[in-house]
Amino acid sequence: FKMSLFLPPISPVKDSTTGRIIQPPTLTPYKEITLQEVYKLITSSERLKTLTETVRRATENGDEKVYRMLKQQTLPYVTPCGVFSYRKSDSLTGPSGLIVVDIDHLDSRQEAEKLKRQLFDDLLLRPVLAFTSPSGHGVKAFIPYDLARIPDTKQNISENIHWAMNYVQAVYDFHSNSADNKKNHPGKGVERSGKK
C-alpha cells in the first residue's frame, strides 16, 4: 500500500498582526510512503509524538482554535487512498487499495481507544492500521478494498469510503460531542488525509 506524505502546513500560515501569509500551504507531496513507513512514523518518531502531545493539550484545554491551528501548521499528513502528484483529488496518480474511516469529536479519549480496538478487530472491515487522531478524541482506520470492483478509480474509492463510514456509523455505538459533525460524514474526496 503506497500513499503520499505531505509536510505541514496544510493551510497558509499567517502573520497574527497583519494577516499576511508568511508560509503557503504544502500542495506537493514530500515523498511516496508505504503503510509500514506510516506505522513506523506514528509509533517511533519522538518528534511526531511531541508535536501530537502539543496538539492534544490544546484539545484538553478546550481551545479549538489553537488545536486546529497547531494541527494544520505542525503535523504531517498522508493520503491513504493513494499517491498524489498534488493536493487535489484529480491529481491521484495511483490508488493504494486503502480508504480511510475518519471518526472525530468523540466524547472522550477512552471512547476513541475503545472504538479504535473495535474497528481494528472488525472482521468485515479488516483494517491494516487504526490509530487515535491528533485530538485524542477520534479514530482513523485504513481499510483495504477491491481495486477492481468498479472500473472508475475515483468512483470506486468514493463508494468504498461511503460504504465503510455508513457501516461504522450503523454498527458501532459511539457518541459525538458535536451536533453537526461533518467530519464523520461519509463521501469525502479521495485526497482525504490521514493526519498523524
Q: What residues fall within each predicted segment?
A:
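Flexible helix-coil linker/hinge segments at domain or subdomain boundaries
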Residues: M165-K196
